[in-house]
Amino acid sequence: MPAELTYEATSRELATDRGVLRYHEAGSGPPLLMLHGSGPGVTGWRNFRGNLARFAEHFRCLVLEFPGFGVSDPTDDHPMMAAGGAVGRFLNGLGLDQVDVVGNSMGGIIGAQFAIRRPERVRRLVTVGGIGPNIFSPNGSEGIRLLMEFTDDPSRERLIRWLRAMVHDQRLVTEELIEERWEQATDPDTLASARRMYGSKAMAARAKAMAQSDEPPYWAMLHKLKARTLITWGRDDRVSPVDMALVPMRTIPDAQLNVFPNCGHWVMIEQKAAWESAVLAFLTRKDEQ
C-alpha cells in the first residue's frame, strides 16, 4: 500500500452534534462516499482499504465509520438508525451537496435509503450484496444464523465459522484476519451494538414488529430510487444469497446487475480487480443527454 494511503495517513475526524464521526480520506476529484457493512469486527477501513488506491486515482474517497462499530463515537441507537442519520450529518459537516455512493451490504441499504429520502444528494449508487428480500431462504441465510450465534455467545470458533461463510476462497480467512476481527468484535461497546442488531432476542423482536407494522419494508420502496444504480453480487454469497438481487434489479428504475463467479459476500475483496473495473466504468460513464 502506498505510504500516503495508510490507516494513519488517511484518518480524519468530524465533530457533530451527535458525537465524533471518524473517516478515511484519499484522492481528489468528485466525492465518493464509501459505506461499510455490518458483522463482527467490521470497519469501513477493513472493507475498503484494498480498493482505495485505484479509486483515489479518480475520486475524493470518503470512507465513513458508522457509529456503534468501534471507531466513531458509540451510540445507544439501533446501528441501522444511527448509520442513516450519520450519513446526512457527515455530508453536511463536509459541505458536500451531492456524492456518488458505494455501499457494502448494510452500507448499500443505508445508501439506498438516503438516496430515496434525498434524491438530489446522490448521483449514482453502487451496492455490494445485502440489498433486497430473501426469496428462496426466507428464514435467514447460513451466514446470518452464524452471525447470530457469535453475537449471542462470542468465541473464536464461532467467529471463524462466520468468517468462512463470508468468502468462497477459504484461504482468505487468515490468522491475521481472525485476530483483527476478534479484537474489534469483542470490544464491549461494539458487542453491545452488535447485539442490538443481530442478537437472537433483537432479531425475534424485529421480526415480530415487522409482522405487526403497517409500514412497508425498505425494499418495497426501492422503486422510488432515482439514482442510477449498479448492483454487484457474489454468486456464491452465503450471507445474502444472490436471489435477493431479483427484487432491486426489477424495481429500481435505472439499475443493472453484475454477478461475480467464485465469490462470496465480500465482492470488493474476493473479486477485487473485476469489481473495481466494473464500478469505475459505471461511475465514470458520461451521463446520457
Can you name each region flagged by the protein language model?
Residues 225, 231-233:
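Short beta-strand/loop motif that positions the catalytic acidic residue
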Residues 138, 155-221:
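Conserved alpha/beta-hydrolase catalytic His-Asp/Glu region
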Residues 103, 107, 111:
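Gly/Ala-rich beta-loop-alpha elbow adjacent to hydrolase catalytic centers
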Residues 236-240:
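Acidic catalytic loop of the alpha/beta-hydrolase fold
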Residues 53, 63-102, 277-280:
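Active-site loop/oxyanion-hole signature of alpha/beta-hydrolase fold enzymes
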Residues 17-71:
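Conserved HGGG/HGGXW glycine-rich cap/lid loop of the alpha/beta-hydrolase fold
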